[in-house]
Amino acid sequence: MEKLTATIIALNEERRLAACLESLRGVADEVVVVDSYSTDHTVAICHDYGCRVTQRHFDGFGAQRQYATSLASHRYILSIDADEVLSPALRESIIRLKEQGFAHRVYAISRLNFYCGYPVKHCGWYPDLQIRLFDKRYANWNLHDVGEKVIFRDSVRPEPVDGD
């Protein structure tokens, strides 16, 4: 079975982080959190879930994500925000990919956006495909301060993954 590292960048995420980490159980073999010196209980929650935590001053979203990727022990990276939760369908899809072996270098995941607590599945907001699962030997984050994206070393077509 393939191994997978989940990477998270965080700052003062104590209210949302536990749900994110709970959704990673049984999916991620390692969770790396790069914390930007939170002043709440973010780091303690990470330790409670067995995450590997490093603190680093924030110097842009792309740089933080790229640094988190560099700390990963495994080839395949699942980059997730601290306020995001894997759906049961996405969990099953990723577990199946791990069991069968990753056949692609880069995967696109549908992001379900919420507005005022309600999911938005119309007006072009869904599926909001995001490159979040990739082989770090062939892809990594650009260094944009905001609007960061995964860039590839060669021309690959992201494979969609079921679930959001």
Where do the PLM segments sit?
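Residues at the starts of beta-strands that form the adenosine-phosphate
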Residues: 3, 29-30
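Acidic helix N-cap motif at the loop->helix transition within catalytic regions
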Residues: 18, 40-49, 89-90
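Conserved donor nucleotide-binding strand/loop of the catalytic core
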Residues: 29, 43-71
